[in-house]
Structures are given as structure tokens and as C-alpha cells.
């Protein structure tokens, strides 16, 4: 009586990036019988963890062969998927890269691809007897796009940092009655990846005090001190 030989088949799942075998599925049956196996569920499992299918050697309708000395082997090859994060693809650092994977790596901190910077002009009154104008603050932003490995979460590459503008505007110094500023304006500055700051100081204007040619001249009229007026066109004068 002819008896069908017991056969074994192995389906290997291989990480193309590392060359490592992710796992081996082993099935067994009789020679000539259909192999009751599908790679679909396992491929979906790895796709949920950031992999992309490269090739699947396991054929539809596969049967066990008649050679018991050699195991039938098929390879399913997968590679690491990639995904961007940046101004056009923003994500929170707590967001999973692979939402269907409970152990998914998360996106990197936002400051890895976005930096907000400022240029601030501070106004100070040297004698503290007047209220200085409010600080002038201008904003700029640097961004870049990172490409991430979906399996590991590591950064694979990045575009150069780019600012949303090249320069901060020049800032005319506001006038302050009774005071002159040490700068008539603050010049335009190039946007850098650091915060910039400059201070404008207001000092009190001098007083005009009339004096008689002869001390204690009783005929010299009593005149109070006269403040020098501000230059209406230049707060530094």
C-alpha cells in the first residue's frame, strides 16, 4: 500500500534592510496535498509595523512535494517603510508612526523640524521716571522636512533648514516726550536660528536755566527752568 510521505514547508519572513529573518512559519502535510497556508495575515501584521512588501515567493495553490529530505522553503521579503514629518506633514511627538502597532515608535520632538525665533527691541528709560514704549517683537520660523524609518523611528535624512523670511524689518524708535533715545532706529537684521535682542535707552533732555550776567541782579526776572524740546523728526535728538 502506497503511503504519502510526510512533508514540511517553511515560509521565511526576511527584513531586507538588516538581512535578518523576522520569523519562520512551518507547516506540514502529505505529499501532493495542498499547503493550507496564506501569507496575507502575516504580511498585514508587518505592514502595520511599518514594513513594505518587496516580494512574496509563496505561490497560490502550492502543494507539498515528494522529497522528504529537503524542506520546501519560500521567502517573503519586506523592507522598512519611510514617512516624512515637517511643515507639510506635521505630527505631534506623541503620535505613533504606525497607528496599528501598539509598540510603534513615535514622531520626533517638534523642535527637530521647526524652530520659532524672535527679534526683540527693548526700550528702557534710564531715570525710571517715565513709562517706556512696549517691546517690539518680530517673529520668524525655521523649518525642514525629516524622512523617518517607520520601523525604527530613526531619522534617515533631512532637507536643509529654511526660514519663512530672510530679514526682520527695521524698527523706527518711537518718540518719548522729555527724553532722547540713543538710537533713532534699529536696522533691519538677517533672520538667524537664534533669538536676537537690542536695547534702546531713553535719557532725559537737558534744561535751559537763564542766569543774570551779574549774580543776584534784582532786575533779572525770575524765570523757571526751560526744558529742551524734542526734535519731532528724530527721537534721538
Regions found by a protein language model. Name each.
Residues 12-32, 57-62, 91-105, 120-149, ...:
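Short, solvent-exposed loop/edge segments of extracellular or virion-exposed proteins
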Residues 37-69, 158-189:
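Surface-exposed interfaces of beta-sheet-rich extracellular modules
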Residues 38, 196, 233-236:
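Long, non-catalytic architectural segments outside compact domain cores
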Residues 17-19, 23, 27, 52, ...:
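Elongated, non-catalytic scaffold/linker segments and compositionally distinctive motifs
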Residues 1-14, 64-118, 122-124, 187-213:
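Conserved "repeat-terminator" motif of extracellular CCP/Sushi domains
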Residues 20, 51, 76, 146, ...:
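Intrinsic-disorder/low-complexity peptide segments enriched for small residues
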Amino acid at each position: 500500500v502506497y503511503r504519502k510521505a510526510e512533508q514540511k514547508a517553511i515560509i521565511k519572513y526576511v527584513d531586507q534592510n538588516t538581512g535578518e529573518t523576522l520569523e519562520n512559519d512551518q507547516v506540514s502535510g502529505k505529499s501532493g496535498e495542498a499547503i493550507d497556508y496564506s501569507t496575507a495575515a502575516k504580511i498585514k501584521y508587518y505592514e502595520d509595523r511599518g514594513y513594505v512588501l518587496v516580494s512574496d515567493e509563496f505561490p497560490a495553490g502550492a502543494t507539498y512535494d515528494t522529497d522528504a529530505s529537503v524542506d520546501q522553503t519560500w521567502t517573503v521579503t519586506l523592507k522598512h517603510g519611510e514617512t516624512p514629518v515637517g511643515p507639510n506633514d506635521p505630527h505631534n511627538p506623541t503620535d505613533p508612526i504606525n497607528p496599528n502597532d501598539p509598540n510603534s515608535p513615535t514622531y520626533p520632538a517638534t523642535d527637530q523640524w521647526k524652530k520659532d525665533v524672535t527679534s526683540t527691541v527693548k526700550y528702557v528709560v534710564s531715570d525710571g521716571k517715565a513709562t517706556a514704549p512696549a517691546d517690539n517683537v518680530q517673529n520668524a520660523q525655521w523649518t525642514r522636512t525629516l524622512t523617518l524609518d517607520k520601523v525604527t523611528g530613526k531619522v534617515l535624512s533631512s532637507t536643509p533648514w529654511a526660514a519663512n523670511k530672510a530679514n526682520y524689518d527695521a524698527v523706527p524708535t518711537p518718540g518719548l516726550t522729555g527724553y532722547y533715545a540713543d538710537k533713532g532706529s534699529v536696522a533691519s537684521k538677517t533672520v538667524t536660528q537664534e533669538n536676537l535682542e537690542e536695547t534702546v535707552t531713553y535719557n532725559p533732555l537737558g534744561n535751559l536755566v537763564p542766569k543774570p550776567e551779574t549774580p543776584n541782579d534784582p532786575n533779572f526776572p525770575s524765570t523757571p527752568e526751560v526744558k529742551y524740546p524734542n526734535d519731532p523728526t528724530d527721537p534721538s535728538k
